[in-house]
């Protein structure tokens, strides 16, 4: 803990339960729910609520475990924007689509909400699926794989999915897919050290309109700024790079962040609790067990349009284990809350608090 920084990371709770490494955490966008996935082939869900009326302290409770039926590691988990559907990506090459029985908008995400049921299994990848994600409209789902492809699926009524494109732009394993927060722009990151950006041509198909090069090793993770004007990427080269949209289809590298001694496996860009002038808070984590929290701010300088200030840092977040995932809570009242998943099988919830 760095006392010379303005904030610290306070551990809210440990959430044990996975029998093997925990790979990813995902907050439900509409309900007080958190999901995690693991090498134990399961997805666990947790609800949270204030400990007392008006209190900032939260109580997390295990709601249920989805025995996904995947035959190998569940590597990725993602919520649809409605909060009612969950997608899982597995090393068995398949993508599972899950819905909860008898779910209603009035329930409080407790045990009475019904069991999760696999409504669709999407097949097509030849080998390990590494990442899944829904577009902001909820009408598209992307998946990527060690088979070097990115698939885009159209979400249709009654849990029907149609493949809209198989994108074969990367020359190596594709590690991550991330949708723009408001537009139908998809980004992917790869073992080939590049980031690809895709859009749909109404007269043609989905295509790659830009390749962002600059990382010197595997690109592990991507996260868009909340307003979508910037894209952050993290890499095996121990850097985070931030890219700015300078034209409709043109992105330019503007800032590099350092602060890790090993691969940066996961990043998450949230709105934060700062002033309206800043672009939010960027959390980074990885193989060195550190979590760094950066405040990103736009400047008036043409040559250096962004500045970054380290707000908080913690080492050994999961003891001696790698940290595989970090994610900010999307609910504005909890914009200072983040979750992590580690090789120790634990999910942890943290809050950024001023010293």
Predicted regions and their residues:
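A short helix->beta-strand "capping" segment at the edge of beta-propeller domains
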Residues: 2-19, 58-63, 114-117, 308-311
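Beta-propeller domains
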Residues: 37-59, 102-103
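WD40-repeat beta-propellers
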Residues: 43-48, 95-100, 150-154, 177, ...
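Blade-level signature of beta-propeller repeat domains, shared across WD40, Kelch, NHL, RCC1
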Residues: 327-355
């Amino acid at each position: 803990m760095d006392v010379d920084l303005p904030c610290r990371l306070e551990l809210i709770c440990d959430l044990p339960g996975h029998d093997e490494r925990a790979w990813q955490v995902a907050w439900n966008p509409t309900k007080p729910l958190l999901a995690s996935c693991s090498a134990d082939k399961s997805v666990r869900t947790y609800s949270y609520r204030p400990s007392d009326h008006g209190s900032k302290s939260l109580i997390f409770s295990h709601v249920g475990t989805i025995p996904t039926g995947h035959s190998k590691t569940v590597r990725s988990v993602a919520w649809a924007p409605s909060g009612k559907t969950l997608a899982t990506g597995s090393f068995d090459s398949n993508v599972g689509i899950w819905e909860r029985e008898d779910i209603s908008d009035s329930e409080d995400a407790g045990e009475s909400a019904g069991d999760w049921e696999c409504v669709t299994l999407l097949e097509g990848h030849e080998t390990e699926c590494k990442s899944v994600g829904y577009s902001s409209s909820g009408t598209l789902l992307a998946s990527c794989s060690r088979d070097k492809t990115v698939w885009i699926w159209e979400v249709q009524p009654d849990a029907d999915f149609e493949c809209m494109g198989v994108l074969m732009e990367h020359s190596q394993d594709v590690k991550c897919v991330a949708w723009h927060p408001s537009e139908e722009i998809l980004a992917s990151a790869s073992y080939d050290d590049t980031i690809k950006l895709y859009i749909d041509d109404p007269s043609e198909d989905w295509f790659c309109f830009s390749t962002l090069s600059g990382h010197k090793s595997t690109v592990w993770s991507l996260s868009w700024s909340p307003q979508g004007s910037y894209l952050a990427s993290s890499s095996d080269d121990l850097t985070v790079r931030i890219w700015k949209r300078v034209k409709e289809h043109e992105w330019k590298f503007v800032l590099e962040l350092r602060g890790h001694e090993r691969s940066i496996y996961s990043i998450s860009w949230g709105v934060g609790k700062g002033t309206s002038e800043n672009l939010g808070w960027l959390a980074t984590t990885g193989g060195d067990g550190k979590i760094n929290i950066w405040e990103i701010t736009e400047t008036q300088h043409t040559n250096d349009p962004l500045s970054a200030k380290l707000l908080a840092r913690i080492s050994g977040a999961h003891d001696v284990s790698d940290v595989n995932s970090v994610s900010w809570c999307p609910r504005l009242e909890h914009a200072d809350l983040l979750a992590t998943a580690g090789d120790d099988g634990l999910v942890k919830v943290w809050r950024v608090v001023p010293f």
